[in-house]
Amino acid sequence: MDLITTAHPERPELDMSFSGKLLRAVAQGEMPESMRLFRPGRTVAFGRLDRMRPGFDDARRVAIAHGMTPVLRHAGGHAAAYDSDSLIIEVFRRHDQGLRGLESRFIEMADLLQRAFAQAGVSLVLGELPGEYCPGRYSLHLPGGPKVVGIAQRVLTDASLTTAVAVVDGGEALRTVIAAVYEALELPLEVNTVGAVTDQYPEASCELVRQTLIDCGIADGSLQPTARLEA
């Protein structure tokens, strides 16, 4: 896979549309399979299930009031919040498996993240926490602590996009945002499931995790050791 580092932190909606552009390009064979690593802007990413809830408009206003940009994502369930203290990992693959390869791609991403974080001195546990935000079987959490990584997929006929959001720092601020957004959406939430890696590992940083992700990708042969920037 090629490595892509392009990001639009000042315009989160562009990051969302850029991901869709890359997925379509991979599906059409216009570019090779790739991994995109970037630090996003202040974002609340709503799922399509959120849009059908009566409190959706209020939740968007709440996000804006907290200085976040609301966007609608194509993958995942319910709302997630992240900012420049988070790291987004996107893996674009071309294949004809469709939904048949769904679980294996989730496992592949979770395994990569656990290996990379372990190399950075951080232990992550696979599994959904009771009452977590944007719940999922392949969430990763700190031992006895909060969820710090969510994983989602978008699947086309000829390609897939597996996305992970790792909250490295700034857990307290995001906890406030998510609690307010979920209250507006009238969704259940155990607030203590919201946090960041630095809650237990204060020495962790986005740059450290980014580098260990690249190192792990190169070591297992899935990632080319050169960066490719997209306009």
Where are the model-predicted features located?
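Short, solvent-exposed loop/turn elements at beta->coil junctions and helix N-caps
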Residues: 75-79, 127-131, 154
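Beta-rich nucleic-acid/ligand-interaction surfaces
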Residues: 126-147
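Short acidic-glycine loop/turn motifs at beta-strand connectors
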Residues: 40, 142-145, 156-157, 170
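Long, positively charged amphipathic alpha-helical accessory segments at protein N-termini or as interdomain linkers
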Residues: 120-122, 151-154, 158-231
